[in-house]
Amino acid sequence: MPAPEQGSLVEEGQPQTHQEAVSTGPGMEPETTATTILASVKEQELQFQRLTRELEVERQIVASQLERCRLGAESPSIASTSSTEKSFPWRSTDVPNPGVSKPRVSDTIHPNNYLIRTEPEQGTLYSPEQTSLHESEGSLGNSRSSTQMNSYSDSGYQEAGSFHNSQTVNKADSRQHPFTGSTSNHVVRTSRAEGQTLVQPSVANRAMRRVSSVPSRAQSPSYVTSTGVSPSRGSLRTSLGSGFGSPSVTDSRPLNPSAYSSSTLPAQRAASPYSQRPASPTAVRRVGSVTSRQTSNPNGPVPQYQTTTRVGSPLTLTDAQTRVASPSQGQVGSSSPKRSGMTAVPQHLGPSLQRTVHDMDQFGQQQYDIYERMVPPRPDSLTGLRSSYASQHSQLGQELRSAVSPDLHITPIYEGRTYYSPVYRSPNHGTVELQGSQTALYRTGSVGIGNLQRTSSQRSTLTYQRNNYALNTAATYAEPYRPVQYRVQECSYNRLQHTGPADDGATRSPSIDSIQKDPREFAWRDPELPEVIHMLQHQFPSVQANAAAYLQHLCFGDNKVKMEVYRLGGIKHLVDLLDHRVLEVQKNACGALRNLVFGKSTDENKIAMKNVGGIPALLRLLRKSIDAEVRELVTGVLWNLSSCDAVKMTIIRDALSTLTNTVIVPHSGWNNSSFDDDHKIKFQTSLVLRNTTGCLRNLSSAGEEARKQMRSCEGLVDSLLYVIHTCVNTSDYDSKTVENCVCTLRNLSYRLELEVPQARLLGLNELDDLLGKESPSKDSEPSCWGKKKKKKKRTPQEDQWDGVGPIPGLSKSPKGVEMLWHPSVVKPYLTLLAESSNPATLEGSAGSLQNLSAGNWKFAAYIRAAVRKEKGLPILVELLRMDNDRVVSSVATALRNMALDVRNKELIGKYAMRDLVNRLPGGNGPSILSDETVAAICCALHEVTSKNMENAKALADSGGIEKLVNITKGRGDRSSLKVVKAAAQVLNTLWQYRDLRSIYKKDGWNQNHFITPVSTLERDRFKSHPSLSTTNQQMSPIIQSVGSTSSSPALLGIREPRSEYDRTQPPMQYYNSQGDTTHKGLYPGSSKPSPIYISSYSSPAREQNRRLQHQQLYYQDDSTRKTLDAYRLYLQSPRSYEDPYCDDRVHFPASTDYSTQYGLKSTTNYVDFYSTKRPSYRAEQYPGSPDSWV
């Protein structure tokens, strides 16, 4: 199934957020009095003065602490052993650390707010106050754990240098911050294994919300959450009580810094683990798609209630505001280095939440300026980041720089299909209650859904290693992996549902590399095609599933993309995924392959898939899979592949037996003793059966060898015929499955006499009496005294079978290939011809009777007799009136073969002559038939009038001579040479009846009208014939050899060049899919809502001179009817589909009442030419003998 089209998300949080931001803005509340405003301003001024003094004292303490950090040599501890996932929690500082004095002083350092971004609709605002970063391990009983949100076992790419390297962070690469008041920040790396719960002591009244950050390898698609400072981009940690990764609030307790050795980060901030700043905030709000940027005068006091929101800033990723303000609050932080190689240090919260907001927006312009001065983006940056990580050796240690490499970003992944999800709100009404009156809206990540199990063993077996910018290692893959943008249409996936409110015990911190990135660059983009193809080889199933689904989406209707995927080798990778153990990967790989091999112009893709073992891989998946959707996709891919001539024989050799035994026989119900109603419903709606029969339909046109193998496949013919019988009994005449079965059987019925040994043994050369003629080549042998008749001993039963009684030569019920030519198959074919309104089914059924009735063997005669017995001749004649070129052509050829039987010839000449003549071009009504169809009608007329003077006279009385003369003389529209020769042949036959020449002369015709010299026909070859056909339409060689063989087009001198392949692919095989040549209407030959149009007309009196009258209009005026340009029937079918369950087919009304549907008059005497209503075929009550017309 193609991936759904990606659409934009409606941000549900915007209206509410905007309202909150406005409601908290200064002066926005109309009921605020001047007295209240003045009091608030004074209170804020006093607070600002107090904070200024505190910060100044703290600056001095920080400077002394910095000096101690530089001089002190730090040794590795247990916290600095290997860890694939590091988190730097915010540390609360209002609980005194042992041995550390914490005076509250003023700080004059201006903070820089960093906007962290994970996706286009989301942003995260962190307070920039910096403190020491520690990650500790403690007992689970006395601590809260940070939350791991949707941990994956397949959530990222591994760096070239593995992070399981047991390196210790012992390099104190400290460097003085260019601004005063900067402090040291410590990164402590614990030995906690990946996926292990991070345990921290909790402290009451201190909370930090961490919901989102830049996407890391561990991020789940449901919640793109921050991993803190996660050097290896490992998985997020899931908190207890927050099973679905809900944002959580954690109380934190200060850790004993002496228990851990730490390496000092180069960029020093205004806080230290030994001098905690009391004014640092303890809550960071994730504001979803709403990015809150507070700006104010950096030098002036901040009013108590003032929160100015900057919307549309380059740092603001969405145009919505949120309210994060409360009275009596301020914020102080350290400034950030204004240089391109900006060192990103995780931000820490201080002890006081009261100063979180007000100073947060004081220096918003300064952080904008910082990003303006950053270096240009690297060409291989994954999300357009601007920081140069290779140049950070002066700020970060080797391992830390390796850890924060930006290329650890991957596409959001999930197990399952391509889902798109809107704004997600957790059960606690989408807001986070902070201290005081502060609230913050948050929204979790909206890309992808689902959890996968994560194992640390998979981290060291990654396929693609990328540049380690810190270690300057060579990359095995130069192109960056960029995240694929997936969104869901509705938030209905069960794994998004929360079972409880958010946990309030986990601490979070932003990742180091996320702080260094320019938020303006955090825009999701569609991945490039080479990236998607490389993701097919990723070790994680969800990445592979997403990549395959995205390829399916890209290939839909785009042949250029299909060819590019083939050029880049994507077909091989998709075929490899067919043997994947994950069901979703199998589905998406099949869907992508189905689109890649759809269409006439994708033969190279089909051949490439065959060459890489795609057909055996599909069959393995079909045999082992029990999932209905997978089986449908597999058979759909095979259906599309079967339209390529170069692949057909490979499918027959490798897949024919498997398709028959695993799909055709079980789904048809042929081997079931009982056929209940439930199986009928399953049978009629089985898409797997539809796809498989469509594949067999294409394969049956691959030539003689293909037909032989399919006929000899056990159970195939029986099952196909059983499907037709079942559908006839359930009145399911127009389904695609029936159409495919009928067309397959038509191809398998071709050249039975010559290709099937059983047919030759069952009775060749025994048809003289049945054909009503003598065949000198068969019944006499030359001798010196002339030809001597053979003496044959025949029982009376073997002489003929007229459709009554047991069939000679068949004493048992037929099985297998014998059922193809058994006369019992005539009845279901005629039922479909009488009841179906699907032109493809009608053409296939008529073509089957055409093939079965051709030939010089007794079963062809039996078929002709069976058609007469089952009253099938009127059914065929009615279809001549149909407004469908290919159906008329097939029916005319079938009638021509039926006329080989003497009694059939009499009936056709008596009751069908007018229909045949009226389909000839000329007269007042324009002809919409192709040259091939007109030639087929002329051949039928020739056969009907041969050796039957009454029929020749009926043709003259019907006005046929005038139309035939117009064709041969080139009057009106020019006809092709084939049509001219066929018409000349009929006229020549009519002139042979000497008794009728007087009638011809009375009507104004002479010999010149009937005899066209061969030289004239040859000259016509060089004339300009605009409508000269180039189609290799030929009659069956068997048809050419029976009856009045002069009616065969081959004897008319109609020879057209054709290759050896054309000889093995006869004209009856119109069933190979040609993919892109199909249009919305399956049958372009008819532009009417219903392709069936049968007119009625009265028979003029015999005494009238019908030759001098204008012919009655054959068709009523219909402005919607268009001229057929080459009606294609089965060359376009089946449709190699791309959409699931999508087979654009024309729906036709049920045709049970022929008087209303086809406009037949309601009279009771059918002998009065064509003016009666034929009795219902399904009533099966036909009066008269087997030779009667009705």
Swiss-Prot record:
| GO biological process per UniProt | cell-cell adhesion; cell-cell junction assembly; positive regulation of cytokinesis; regulation of Rho protein signal transduction
Describe its membrane topology: Peripheral membrane protein
Q: Where is this region: Disordered?
A: 1-32, 73-347, 772-809
Q: Which UniProt keywords apply?
A: Cell adhesion, Cell junction, Cell membrane, Coiled coil, Cytoplasm, Cytoskeleton, Membrane, Methylation, Phosphoprotein, Repeat
Primary localisation category: other
Q: Bias regions of kind Polar residues — which residues?
A: 77-86, 138-156, 163-203, 213-229, 247-266, 289-323
Residue numbers carrying Phosphotyrosine = Y371, Y414, Y477
Q: What does this protein do?
A: Plays a role as a regulator of Rho activity during cytokinesis. May play a role in junctional plaques.
What is the protein name for this chain? Plakophilin-4
Q: What is the lineage of its organism?
A: Eukaryota, Metazoa, Chordata, Craniata, Vertebrata
